[in-house]
Design a protein with these regions (language model features):
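Short beta-strand element of the alpha/beta-hydrolase
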Residues: 54-66
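Primarily recognizes the serine-hydrolase "nucleophile elbow" in alpha/beta-hydrolase
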Residues: 122-203
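Alpha/beta-hydrolase active-site loop
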Residues: 109-132, 262
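Short amphipathic alpha-helix adjacent to the substrate-entry channel of hydrolases
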Residues: 73-93
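C-terminal catalytic histidine-bearing segment of alpha/beta-hydrolase fold enzymes
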Residues: 43, 224-227, 233-293
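Short beta-strand/loop motif that positions the catalytic acidic residue
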Residues: 204, 210-212
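Conserved alpha/beta-hydrolase "acid-adjacent" motif
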Residues: 217-224
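N-terminal cap/lid segment of alpha/beta-hydrolase-fold proteins
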Residues: 20-55
């Protein structure tokens, strides 16, 4: 089957009413790759069947966070389930986790993150290869992820290398847009260009929306330089939203899970990927995202 287009534990204390991480029922599981006897899987959520001719719909593909060496795909079940109710096909992916960072790696020019990106590229190609069966438009795929997963989604769709030679031929990994939840970019990636988003970022970068807590150091040391480069390159649609006073992974729990999803929904509507208004209600507690100029 073909290609498809993220969330991390909060690092600051939240009120007890918001303590539980959002979740949703499991999607339908598919194997997108077999590697060394291990099945790599993704879960897909489909919209309810409608009467009449079926038109292909946009597809979302999400990659979980966890520091490249941890995390699970259930992080984006809530997001995928929601967007399936809005008429899209949405997938959340399991990928090969990176080995733990070691002192030796600091001396190497190759990042441990490479294995994650290779699997992500395989998942996107599988999504595109099976677009007809899945009911998606391979030219309207939205990629994304949270923290490490945000980084993985960005590099899997921009770096020309790190390909699995066993992937189906004739399918690239480009996408039409991004949903990015505090993507973890680092100046330390510069030693390995194939995992460094700043070196892969070009003027034709697709529309994106990124969410950060104002107290998240990953924003200051990673996304700020990328956002500045986007502006200098003339990237036309780079939406940057900030949750004041919040830290890394804030979007994993309510009310911010719904606040960010509502903003993502409106972003996709502006691009023509979705119709109507968000079906989630804004929190009565008044949490809002500020738009970065």
């Amino acid at each position: 089957m073909k290609n498809l287009i993220f969330i991390v534990w909060a690092t600051m204390a939240l009120p007890s009413a918001y303590a539980q991480r959002v979740t949703a029922p499991e999607g339908k599981t598919y194997v997108y790759k077999e590697a060394n006897g291990v099945s790599r899987e993704l879960e897909i959520y489909f919209p309810k069947a409608k009467q009449g001719p079926k038109k292909p719909v946009p597809g979302i593909i999400m990659f979980h966070g966890g520091g490249w060496g941890g995390g699970t795909r259930d992080q984006f079940r809530y997001l995928c389930h929601y967007f399936s109710t809005r008429g899209l096909v949405a997938a959340t992916v399991t990928y090969k986790l990176a080995p733990k960072a070691r002192t030796e790696e600091a001396k190497s020019t190759e990042s441990r993150k490479r294995v994650c990106i290779t699997d992500a590229k395989s998942a996107i190609r599988w999504y595109k290869q099976n677009a007809d069966e899945l009911g998606i438009d391979p030219k309207r795929i939205i990629a994304g992820g949270g923290s490490a997963g945000g980084h993985i989604s960005l590099l899997a769709t921009t770096t020309p290398g790190l390909n699995d030679p066993n992937d189906p031929k004739g399918y690239d990994t480009s996408v039409a847009a991004y949903l990015l939840f505090n993507p973890a970019l680092s100046a330390g990636d510069a030693k390995d260009p194939e995992v460094d988003f700043l070196q892969q970022l070009k003027a034709d970068f697709p529309p994106s929306i990124a969410f950060f807590g104002s107290e998240d150091n990953w924003m200051k040391k990673g996304w700020d330089p990328a956002y500045d480069k986007m502006k200098s390159l003339g990237v036309k649609s780079a939406d940057f939203r900030i949750a004041e006073g919040m830290g890394h992974g804030f979007f994993n729990r309510q009310p911010w899970a719904d606040v960010t999803l509502i903003a993502a929904d409106k972003f996709l509507k502006e691009l023509g990927f979705i119709e109507g208004e968000p079906t989630l209600a804004a929190p009565k507690t008044g949490e809002k995202l500020a738009k970065r100029p």
